[in-house]
């Protein structure tokens, strides 16, 4: 460690960011961040360039007007409007061309110089200024540019007083570059900070009274980390010099430390500032220490600015502020992992878990109480190391996951901005529709020329047609103020979707209930992008909706509709991007860029159906209806090929039948039945592969309008349990689990043991090996508990939500206050608060816990894993055995009653060992005839019972099916018995 004063630190970094240099007309640079100054009417663009093998940073200012849109409320009696408004076709249900089109009158106004009240009326208020710049100019974050004339950067600013940059002269001053012409990536400068807070050791840290002990900062530039730690201590401290390359500055005034940290950001000049849960903890805590003031952020010689905040609401209703840093890109990486469904394969979103999963690395292990004790004893070296390590990991994660390319691809392709990094897909599509509506064109049928055909996307219309009406109020699309089109004027090809005032209930795709069992040589036949193909085929677009006088909504078949053209463009775009990606044999930079862009094309196209499911269920339901029809037709076609003469002759078989075992939305599992001796084992998989390809070709020969099925997998062994729950060995001899043994509410060790057991069935088709493996692993993990295996392998976890979601309106006569429901998560959090641990979970955090073997219900037994001591506390295996009970019943469903005795023997052996030291939760298992009507077990006798009527939904029940809310279907299993757990006498 290098112990310096703050002035010495500034001197050490004096040349870290060069201020004066030349930029030639051959030098490419990249726009990293833009900020629009509404007061001055100019755009500030922050850019990076590689000059002489070193990263150079600068900014330029461009004079421009930025526009927004607001409704015009003029009566429009005369031919011209005094407000000079423009009339646009409405995007949602506009009507029928050449008959009647609903219009919205819109005033385009300058944001620079407009009043606050005018901006609050804007119809595009869901956009950031950067979005507007992206839509109205060629300056887009992430794009590569080049100056048309050589420039000189002075004090980090490229400017020419004699010829200031202006939007109307953009093409004279700048050249937009195609990334494919470049050989190297220009990366942003990355920074990440983290704070460590003090406490009295009995309560959680509170900004009103507990100081910030230190602020760590890591900066990544030119493939190198710089590490700095700002430390506060009220007394003189000595930190020994060490070989570590961390710069350490000690302050005896906390406010001076905080101010110095934010000043130093200007010195190292990052483009991206990361934190981990900073929106919820670090930034509010810093504000608390500053008596509620927001810190000032400076960059270059630009005016200092405070961060802006905006309310961020998660899908489950949790509400937090998001901080925007104006001149810098600020990303709370914790939120990214929380909202991105693609990251749900990790156990939780703690930084340590993510680092181990993606980086194979972990945090420095330092107990919070130990840290506070060290601080009080002036032993700061380990604290500094811990603090700085927490700053390195988020940057490494960001780079490992190639999130820079993802962030800028969203900007270039969909006019999002860097502040939209954690936006949901709904915002992405709304922003895209807004831009496409204003710039829409179509081919003139008379001349064949492309002509302008603008629409206006009014996001308020989405809320109107998707909101649920109260009693006595209009519902559905009748809330839209649209003139009804006479039935005679509705095109004959239009599709009737349903009643205008219908309160639509969403109906999903077709799912066949499979018969549980083990099957050999099944294959899957899936539709290629089924819902996307349907949307193109039926011309699914909000501009094609027609509200008719007969009380129904119709879907016009205009193939030039905005969404149809978007989907066709995305399909073509993805195909071209994949070709570009695969052709990159030398440039890793271009390979990663094209890969991120093609993935984003796929994600967007696949999400538009879900967008309709939120805002226009009538249209979404019709799409799923067509999907069900296509899947039904495919099943009939496949099974109709049984003993087809051409197939029998081609493959030299006497019999070949096809049975569809399972179907789900856009896929089918097909079992070919043949005489084994007619297809020799040596070449069986190859022959079956050719049969699958022949079936694919025959099925696709009957489909038109772009519908295609593809042979996906020939599964040497398939285990079907129930709908959406199965596993198989794929073409590459890899085991794949879908919906089964994957949920996070199951402890890791049980998932490992169950999967290992099922692998014996998949690899050897041997139940005895399956049960031997299950027994051996379950007993091994029992013996290793608290000794060689981490406690996290045995724990459960639950998301903490307090006060999330909507609140019911108060009546005149207020109802008696409801009893506060204590969930497992809330119970564990209260224990953590009372014990003053280093981490108190907030809304949306998952809390790992175990059950204690003690008197009480499951909630009362729950205890946070962070505080559990295996040497002094006794764990309850009650919940674990309930999960085991579910798994044994699943095996019974698959293998049937004839194997119930072998299953019972294995189950009893495991249960006996786990119950041997239990004092309060001893259980025994019994086989029960399913058809036998029995008296419901008492509260003390049966585990896994349902919650009583009137109780809150239980957080304690395990093994509950994800299909619980689905309609009942005929039982399709092999067993008439099931296992139940009872209290041991």
Swiss-Prot record:
Pfam families: DNA_pol_B, DNA_pol_B_exo1. InterPro entries: DNA-dir_DNA_pol_B, DNA-dir_DNA_pol_B_CS, DNA-dir_DNA_pol_B_exonuc, DNA-dir_DNA_pol_B_multi_dom, DNA/RNA_pol_sf, DNA_pol_B_thumb, DNA_pol_palm_dom_sf, DNA_pol_type-B. It catalyses: DNA(n) + a 2'-deoxyribonucleoside 5'-triphosphate = DNA(n+1) + diphosphate. SMART domains: POLBc. One of its GO terms (biological process) is viral genome replication. Its EC number is 2.7.7.7. Keywords: DNA replication, DNA-binding, DNA-directed DNA polymerase, Early protein, Nucleotidyltransferase, Transferase, Viral DNA replication. Residues 954-967 have a biased composition (Acidic residues). It is an enzyme of class 2 (transferase). The keyword Transferase applies. GO terms for molecular function: DNA binding; DNA-directed DNA polymerase activity; nucleotide binding. Replicates the viral genome, host DNA polymerases cannot substitute for the viral enzyme in this process. Belongs to the DNA polymerase type-B family. This is DNA polymerase. It comes from Orgyia pseudotsugata multicapsid polyhedrosis virus. The gene is POL.
